[in-house]
């Protein structure tokens, strides 16, 4: 069903390592409003969806969220690549480093591992679409918060792209709710 292209949807080219920022952005990988949860939510909701057009949107957006997950992992990798222990020590990333070194393990910024309980799938299309609208808004808010905390233009460029895509996803789901 999927075709994998060996390039990201949007380029990730981080020049400066920053373990503190990596520890914040990790939340969009495995946090309650992150990309893994979004992709799992939409790709599982499609199985109980009675409308082909909505199933197509859930599949499209869920697939795109997998790509966003890859982009977040690339940001984390580039922010932590070749860090010294001195650069890590004393940052919030140090606790993460103990368990995962610099891998992209799905956790929230608080350190809580990803949990499928974040994924809302009820089997009622209106309930699920309203869950999706809320999920996209929460993801956008999280990206807004990251932008408030980040002073890295390379990171901010990618985060702004991802934030914009959350708005597009919200609009696509809203169109389906409004069309009945």
Which residues make up each language-model segment?
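Non-heme di-metal
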Residues: 1-180
């Amino acid at each position: 069903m999927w075709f994998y292209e060996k390039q990201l949807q949007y380029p990730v080219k981080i020049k400066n390592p920053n373990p503190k920022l990596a520890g914040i952005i990790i939340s969009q990988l495995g946090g309650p409003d992150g990309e893994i949860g979004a992709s799992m939510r939409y790709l599982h909701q499609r199985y109980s969806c009675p409308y082909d057009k909505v199933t197509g949107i859930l599949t499209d957006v869920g697939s795109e969220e997998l790509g966003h997950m890859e982009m977040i992992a690339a940001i984390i990798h580039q922010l932590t690549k070749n860090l010294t222990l001195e650069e890590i020590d004393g940052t919030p990333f140090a606790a993460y480093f103990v368990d995962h070194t610099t891998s992209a393990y799905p956790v929230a910024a608080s350190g809580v591992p990803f949990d499928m309980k974040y994924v809302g799938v009820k089997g009622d299309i209106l309930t699920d679409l309203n869950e999706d609208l809320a999920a996209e808004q929460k993801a956008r808010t999280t990206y807004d918060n990251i932008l408030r905390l980040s002073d890295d233009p390379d990171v901010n460029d990618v985060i702004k792209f991802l934030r914009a895509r959350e708005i597009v996803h919200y609009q696509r789901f809203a169109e389906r709710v409004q069309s009945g």
